[in-house]
Amino acid sequence: MMKKLLSNELVQIKRAELKEKFSKLDQKVKFAIVLIGDNASSKIYVKKKIEFAQDIGVEAKLFHFEENVDFNLLKDAFKKIDKEYDGIILQLPVLHFDVNELLLMIDKNKDLDGLNPENEKAFYENRECIIPATARAIWTFLKFHKISVENKKVFVVGQSRLVGKPISQFLKNNNAIVRVFDKSTGLKGTEEADILIVATGVAQLIKAENIKENSILIDVGFSKINNKIYGDLDIESIKEKALKYTPPIGAIGPVTVLSLFENLYEIILKKK
């Protein structure tokens, strides 16, 4: 019987630890989210991040701009935010603007997502940096569930900046045998993976023929079709073949939010 892996217990433990850590600091930590436009999914994610921040004693503030906001106004806003806040997130996706240009407006030492190009460069060169939040989340999740990647075939489907690329690098740094798949490669070969991490946003993409017997499947995909939520895994197809899997809700997502605030705490410590 395929086992469902969840993050409830992990998040509960880590949240309590973070709450205690922040309470012992000699300052009130302030965190800002910049949201441009009215993407419905982005609003949900922003709400969850603000709720988490408030729960652990971090002051949170949303800076919400219209999609057609003037670029110079944005630049001025980032300068003001940088002066007042300890950690900053630019909520993605962003339309109509060069994302790198916006990310460079965030001080690399306040960049909770680890996506500022300077942080990214350091990360891919295996230098000290802020770890991209989703990669950190997947790693934390695997460790909590005692899933070792060392010398295992850990394959990644999807090469996104947020998930696929950073987690692939993180796995290589931790002695996994990594292979990456995307639209250009197709899925042939995924069935050899001991652990398969999927992050494409294509609903029910991965079926029984794409996986190895008794493999572990980590689903970071999220799709909403006719008000129903799907991950990248076709659960009905894989349920007799996989050993363990994560659902699209209650697994990696909550740990990603947690990871942002682990990054924030480490940022504060480095400044002391």
Curated annotation (Swiss-Prot):
Q: Which domain of life is it from?
A: Bacteria
Give the InterPro entries listed for this entry. Answer: Aminoacid_DH-like_N_sf, NAD(P)-bd_dom_sf, THF_DH/CycHdrlase, THF_DH/CycHdrlase_cat_dom, THF_DH/CycHdrlase_NAD-bd_dom
Q: Which GO terms describe its biological process?
A: L-histidine biosynthetic process; methionine biosynthetic process; purine nucleotide biosynthetic process; tetrahydrofolate interconversion
Q: Cross-referenced Pfam families, in alphabetical order? A: THF_DHG_CYH (PF00763), THF_DHG_CYH_C (PF02882)
List the keywords (alphabetical).
Answer: Amino-acid biosynthesis, Histidine biosynthesis, Hydrolase, Methionine biosynthesis, Multifunctional enzyme, NADP, One-carbon metabolism, Oxidoreductase, Purine biosynthesis
Q: Which GO terms describe its cellular component?
A: cytosol
PANTHER family from the entry?
C-1-TETRAHYDROFOLATE SYNTHASE, CYTOPLASMIC (PTHR48099:SF5), C-1-TETRAHYDROFOLATE SYNTHASE, CYTOPLASMIC-RELATED (PTHR48099)
The family annotation for this protein states: Belongs to the tetrahydrofolate dehydrogenase/cyclohydrolase family.
Quote the subunit structure annotation: Homodimer.
Q: What is this protein called?
A: Bifunctional protein FolD
This protein's species is: Mycoplasmopsis pulmonis (strain UAB CTIP) (Mycoplasma pulmonis)
